[in-house]
């Protein structure tokens, strides 16, 4: 952050400041976030987000009018959204690796048209809060949420097309 602040005195070019932020600051804020993100409290999440908010204020300078508007202008996501996207991407990549296949066991009844069982992956059950907030159950829940979203999108698509699936992309 100090480097970003110093550079902001020499240049007002937002792309240069964004490059410094993305390469020097954001990487430190997100390092190994797929492991520790699920265990964050709301206060810790706000503290981490506060760092990005300060960086965005430095980058925007006098044109800063609010955090959400600045994120849209700079085409940035909140750090929480980025951590969720990275965790989902990590979980999907892990499904393809044989050594991680046991972390995400499939339900026996899970196939595309099953409506009785809403979850595709078995979420490990535990009585301890520490395990419930750890990475593996969090990633399992994240995969289930993504699976349900895809299933709803497919159902909506089939309803729109009256059950006929077209090869042409929908615009």
Kindly give the residue locations of the regions a language model identified.
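Hydrophobic/basic alpha-helical segments
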Residues: 1-171
